[in-house]
């Protein structure tokens, strides 16, 4: 029986939000770490009879659940986040991202983050925040079947559905299924989005703890209409005649027959980008080691197993399709002329990829009493087949690629938990991406309870530019051929965390050469010079009075040298509000005001045809601070979010009074006015 009100042992008391896994090179599980966080505990052997008694006293915990999860590249067990102050924990777009006016549209990070990935990459990342990924797959362990349903409704029929179910089929075998739908017609013409994502994963471990099996299926189907931004021949945003923003003319998708849709489950995109991907991963491990046991009493023995040598094989199969299409092109529009489209027939560009990868690795655990110290060595063979096509080509152009790489990793978290060392690297020995590499090292130390944790590290990546920069890509429309050298990215990073002060100070210093980028709607370029960029981030939580809190994040960014990168000097996000229970034992609530702001800068423009943000140095974005009010609360397993966003867009004077003073996400791409969102998430246990 589903229980709407139950005590979730771990869910109700966990306060610390689990951090998302750090992106690994290639997002390839074969190259990611898989540590053993503790000695493997076997099933408890108990010879005593445990018969049931229908008349026994109920404790109130019969409907409780203990649930933990881990990621593929780590054995550290984590618990659900029960805090309610951060809406982005349930919303796909992080707070430090901007999206093009409609949830589901292309999005980018305001905080500069280069692509830290060696080897092959297709090159289409504008919709990455909406994808389910391999790295974020959670492998659960639960004492009872657990389900979670979520529904979010926003202005202009914005909707999001979230479904999660996990259960242990056996004590040593768990399976989980997750689905998410994002659908939004948008505020402006030809802006609708429809994204479907699902994930199935399973984790099995033999009773003797020697064999482990990880299985993942992830698929995404993303569809987003593209309008090219609003037209600028008239001041439409300031005109009282266009207070209804859907009446403002746009640059793409305006030909008769290309009508907007508001069908909830429709995926009918006439002019826009359609991306899809499918991943299947099977990882198998077999351990050799030492047995042990703990004798609890005369009748109970807990068997233990300490791995000393591990053999691992990871198989990955993936299919990826990236397509722009326009069923009703209009060659008279300036944007088409700029891109060189002169046809009245349906137009499309497409890259399709199929990947098969096999990885073999060996782990050794030097210290029996410290399973979090290990050395990993391995090699992988990657086979790629691509097909590139457009409406102007004679037909699909096939291409096959292969890569052979070696990789290694060392990790050591000392038993006193004062030191944590991590180092990994991969090197492409042969193939189409030979000489690509990625090297990383990080040291973390607990200085003292007063000072906190200090981390310092270095990373260097030598990578071939993404395949969208290759002349063979179906998205290559430039008349002249061009070759690109390997990019080199060096990164020095560090952080200081002080839990007592609820503060974290971090910094990144980038040194980049041969940076490949887009500098126009359909033009690629490479900066041969060397430039650097410095980032400093301060995160701090202040107590104003009792339960009144102020959470603040401030990011400072500065470039030097010939940098084809524009970033705001300062970005900040602040929350000021109440966090507590208002005297009710089962209530947890947070309400107050949220503010986001960045200093004026020349933000990247967007190419709808390429699905890429590109560098521009002519238009300066000067936005007012984003202001919103929020009321979030949790009652046992029911969670709700009520939000009023973009209050800063209210215009007090003139004939265009109302929420019409829109901010810009990119040149010619305005954000919405007032936006109301209501989301509910409910957990159930069987």
Q: Where do the PLM segments sit?
A:
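Cleavable N-terminal signal peptides
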Residues: 1-2, 12
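A generic structural signal for short coil/turn motifs at secondary-structure boundaries
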Residues: 3-8, 185-189, 430-432, 560-564
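Sec/Tat signal peptide C-region and signal peptidase I cleavage site
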Residues: 8-14
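Exposed beta-strand and adjacent loop surfaces of beta-rich binding modules
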Residues: 11, 174, 374
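Membrane-proximal, glycine/serine-rich, low-complexity loop/turn segments characteristic
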Residues: 15-278, 289-295, 444-452, 667-674, ...
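Exposed, low-structure sequence patches enriched in small/polar residues
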Residues: 116, 142-144, 264-334, 338-686
